[in-house]
Amino acid sequence: MKAGATSMWASCCGLLNEVMGTGAVRGQQAGFPGSTGPFRFTPSSDFPTYPPAATEGPNIVCKACGLSFSVFRKKHVCCDCKKDFCSLCSVSQENLRRCSTCHLLQETAFQRPQLMRLKVKDLRQYLLLRNIPTDTCREKEDLVDLVLCHRGLGSGDDLDSSSLNSSRSQTSSFFTQSLFSNYTPPSATVSSFQGELMDRDGAFRSEVLAQVQSEIASANTDDDDDDDDDDDDDEDDDDEQEEEEQNPGLSKKKARASLSDLSSLEEVEGMSVRQLKEILARNFVNYSGCCEKWELVEKVNRLYKENEENQKSYGERMQLQDEEDDSLCRICMDAVIDCVLLECGHMVTCTKCGKRMSECPICRQYVVRAVHVFKS
């Protein structure tokens, strides 16, 4: 049994050697204590070793959304900033591809009012796509100035086309000048050609002179008319100023009612509510608590009576000018003191002078309001 098992084992080992190659199967050796089985497989020199898989290059992604390109998300290069964008983040326009940021700024035609309406994020993104630092920009206006300053960086095609057109125009003008300079007309037609040129020049000059003279004449007439109109306007203004100086209350009387318009108490009853309120407001009388017309009439009657009494007392005091009177206004020294200045509460002026005061003449405090007072 042992001899049969040994021969079977040897035949199996020989078969494996033929299949795997010589030395592919080795018995368990003492130098390999880590082996657990009776066989140890080693790579044969007959089989080639494959190189390791090459590491993939840097994955290119879209500059706008950050997603990698694929079959469904194709890569496009912006014609302005020359950066890579996907089909969703770029706009096709006249067989050219622009990213959404460049397209947005291109729509504004780089006009300052239109650029100021854009978001700061779009302006900053436009500058970053062109590798322009924006660290020093603190306001939106700084970004707009930076865009306008560097707008020539993205318009190389336009510059090239403009330079090409200018060079073409220069070359064409050069050729035309050279042709006309080298051309010599026949001697028989030189005199006739010069005569035609002189006739045309003379006619053209005469037409130009006629147009210039007509324009000068029309301009002079227009200037004369304008001067006449200005003189008329100045005369009208002078007349109006003279009328206002002679009657300073005329324009105000037309606009608002005044206490001086009243000649008697009977006229107060015929006035409207608006006129009554205007009279009270001009004399600094508060009518906020008045709900009926008769209340306004009563206040205007009282104001009118007090005004008449003040005028009578003023006429009497004019006869006694030498006597000192403490009830006269300290500003004009003509009218009676009938006004209190708020917030200080001093009574030193009349109503007319009080409404012109910006500060109290006694305490120098700012005058918030001047209020007419009635003497009891």
Swiss-Prot record:
A zinc finger (RING-type) spans 329-364. It holds the Pfam family FYVE_CARP1-2. One of its GO terms (molecular function) is phosphatidylinositol phosphate binding. The keyword Ubl conjugation applies. The modification Phosphoserine is found at residues 169, 258, 260. InterPro entries: CARP1_2_FYVE, CARP1_FYVE, RING-FYVE_E3_ubiquitin-ligase, RNF34L-like_HeH, SAP_dom_sf, Znf_FYVE_PHD, Znf_RING, Znf_RING/FYVE/PHD. Pathway: Protein modification; protein ubiquitination. The keyword DNA-binding does not apply. Residues 216-256 are annotated as: Disordered. Keywords: Apoptosis, Cell membrane, Cytoplasm, Membrane, Metal-binding, Nucleus, Phosphoprotein, Repeat, Transferase, Ubl conjugation, Ubl conjugation pathway, Zinc, Zinc-finger. Residues 221-246 have a biased composition (Acidic residues). One of its GO terms (biological process) is regulation of oxygen metabolic process. Gene3D superfamilies: 1.10.720.140, SAP domain, Zinc/RING finger domain, C3HC4 (zinc finger). It is a peripheral membrane protein. Its EC number is 2.3.2.27. Induction: Down-regulated in response to cold exposure. Residues 115-134, 268-282 form the SAP domain. A zinc finger (FYVE-type) spans 56-107. Interacts with CASP8 and CASP10. Interacts with p53/TP53; involved in p53/TP53 ubiquitination. Interacts (via RING-type zinc finger) with MDM2; the interaction stabilizes MDM2. Interacts (via RING-type zinc finger) with PPARGC1A. Interacts with NOD1. PANTHER family: CASPASE REGULATOR, RING FINGER DOMAIN-CONTAINING, E3 UBIQUITIN-PROTEIN LIGASE RNF34. This is E3 ubiquitin-protein ligase RNF34. The lineage of its organism: Eukaryota, Metazoa, Chordata, Craniata, Vertebrata. The gene is Rnf34.
